[in-house]
Curated annotation (Swiss-Prot):
One of its GO terms (molecular function) is rRNA binding. The gene is rpsK. Keywords: Ribonucleoprotein, Ribosomal protein, RNA-binding, rRNA-binding. One of its GO terms (cellular component) is ribonucleoprotein complex. Belongs to the universal ribosomal protein uS11 family. This is Small ribosomal subunit protein uS11. It comes from Wolbachia pipientis subsp. Culex pipiens (strain wPip). Part of the 30S ribosomal subunit. Interacts with proteins S7 and S18. Binds to IF-3. SUPFAM superfamilies: Translational machinery components. InterPro entries: Ribosomal_uS11, Ribosomal_uS11_bac-type, Ribosomal_uS11_sf.
Amino acid sequence: MKKVKTVGKNTKRFITGIVHIRATFNNTFVNVTDVCGNTLYQTSVGACGFSGSRKSTPYAAGKVADSAAKKVIERFGMKVVSVIIRGPGFGAEAAVKALRNCGLTVTSIADKTAIPHNGCRLRKKRRV
């Protein structure tokens, strides 16, 4: 008698989740977690095929958020997310728009960019 193999993994279904968007001046990172903070999927603009100065564009950030949303919907059946944005980059708003256009319901958007209260000394100014 042949053994029957199961195809695919038994994955848990997560209806709600948190999308962490780290938008720097040179890159954008998207990390999707469950409500406990366990990472379900993570990607960046460089992993989606962009390189050089094209990584810092809002279009690239939208594309990476779009691919992350499609993967999470397909794998885990996620429908509702809350978004946490960190960093001063240009791609944060484009990434949130891409999440909405992909079919995810965005319940809240929080900007948790770290702002120093005159803590550490800044880097030296660039001279051009």
